[in-house]
Amino acid sequence: MALFIVTVSELTDYIAEKFEKDDWLNQVAVEGELSNCKFSQGHLYFTLKDERAELKGVMYKGRASALPFIPQDGQKVIVFGQVAVYKKRGIYQIYAEMIEPLGIGALYLKFEQTKEKLRDKGYFAEERKKKLPRYPEKIGIVTSKNGAAIRDILTTIKKRWPKATLYLVPVAVQGDEAPGQIVKALNLLNRYKLCEVIILARGGGSFEELAAFNEETVADAIYASNIPVVTGIGHETDTSIADMVADRRAPTPTGAAVEATPNLVEIWNNLREQRQKMVKALANYFQREQKNLEFQERRILRAYEKLITDKSREVTEGLERLLRSFKTTFQQEKNRLSLLKEKLILLSPYLRHKQQKEKLEELKERLFLRCAELLKRNQAVLIQQSLRLRTSVKNLVLQKNLVLSSYEERLKLLNPLKILNRGYAVVFDFEGRVVTSVNNLPERFKIKFSDGEALAKALGKNIIEGDKNDDL
């Protein structure tokens, strides 16, 4: 057999043509373990191997960017594609069109990789999550317009918080279009600030059916939302990436509605309890103020009595001093008169006697005039002190009366029964509880007026319709 001499290129072209004409090699699925994985200019280069052989492989940028997971060394995969010759190096390799992981599956692998990526970015951090509004008036709902989820949410909100205005943005909750619709719905509610809290929910399903809520784009939209997001996705055992990013996570759609709303019945009960506490506190305050007023009254009376006692003592002491002064002066003049009398007796002559007698009469008259003048002056001082005492006592009594009047006015203002003087009345049941609604009116009841109570019997009820939420 004659041998033909060919060039390397000719031989390589010949072999490449054989590969191209082999239908099986043009569409092959190869199972193996990835190694030497690397990206270069967007292209993925890898080696696929098993226990006995290795196969070079490449996936071009357009297909590599669409992979639902990141290929890594050691992963067991199935590579779908075409086996052909790489003429420049004279080797054959597989040109991959699709790569699927074995074992945990592509969706779960993508889930784990996305979760790790978002955790590193801080999407799950508790400190960045927003607080839910306590009494939301507007609630956005992002879910399917059909199915049990929306029915459960509407039923729960109607029961717990019927005053809220609801904005439903219907979306697909599974399938290829679901992530995009969910993102648009969240962005719409944020752009126009339509609500104060958003419920993102769907009913239970398989891991594949919940895949839309594991998409990174949905997580980005939740993270970027300025409005708090509450999720209720699947059943209690299901946890999606959307749940991890959300500001509050509930196990079911019903649970999400509970998390997003307060309980109106509980609020009414709390208000009723607070009102009872306020009435009790007001009664206690009134009682304390009344005791304080009585104490102030006793204190003022004691101060008034003490002032009277002190002033009386001062007057008595002044009178005693005046009397002692008068007695001293009178005694001094009396002693002087006695001395003169003794001198007169000693002189004895008639003329001297007459002169001394006249002088004695003059001195006697001067003595009485001086005593009268002294008595009059001291009497004026006594009257002046008495007037000052009376004025001081009068001013003190007036001042204390003003204080008492001020406390009396404050007590009147604090008296909860004062309103009854203007024609109002309070209805009690026979247990002493205030009846605040016609719906709670018993058949027999008591009516309290400003001057007494009356027993009454209900002959009928007339309910006046109005805004039930006015008290909120």
UniProtKB/Swiss-Prot annotation:
<protein>
    <recommendedName>
        <fullName>Exodeoxyribonuclease 7 large subunit</fullName>
        <ecNumber>3.1.11.6</ecNumber>
    </recommendedName>
</protein>
<dbReference type="GO" id="GO:0009318">
    <property type="term" value="C:exodeoxyribonuclease VII complex"/>
</dbReference>
<keyword id="KW-0963">Cytoplasm</keyword>
<keyword id="KW-0540">Nuclease</keyword>
<dbReference type="GO" id="GO:0003676">
    <property type="term" value="F:nucleic acid binding"/>
</dbReference>
<dbReference type="GO" id="GO:0008855">
    <property type="term" value="F:exodeoxyribonuclease VII activity"/>
</dbReference>
<dbReference type="InterPro" id="IPR020579">
    <property type="entry name" value="Exonuc_VII_lsu_C"/>
</dbReference>
<dbReference type="GO" id="GO:0005737">
    <property type="term" value="C:cytoplasm"/>
</dbReference>
<keyword id="KW-0269">Exonuclease</keyword>
<comment type="similarity">
    <text>Belongs to the XseA family.</text>
</comment>
<dbReference type="InterPro" id="IPR025824">
    <property type="entry name" value="OB-fold_nuc-bd_dom"/>
</dbReference>
<dbReference type="Pfam" id="PF13742">
    <property type="entry name" value="tRNA_anti_2"/>
</dbReference>
<dbReference type="Pfam" id="PF02601">
    <property type="entry name" value="Exonuc_VII_L"/>
</dbReference>
<dbReference type="InterPro" id="IPR003753">
    <property type="entry name" value="Exonuc_VII_L"/>
</dbReference>
<keyword id="KW-0378">Hydrolase</keyword>
<dbReference type="GO" id="GO:0006308">
    <property type="term" value="P:DNA catabolic process"/>
</dbReference>
<comment type="function">
    <text>Bidirectionally degrades single-stranded DNA into large acid-insoluble oligonucleotides, which are then degraded further into small acid-soluble oligonucleotides.</text>
</comment>
<comment type="subunit">
    <text>Heterooligomer composed of large and small subunits.</text>
</comment>
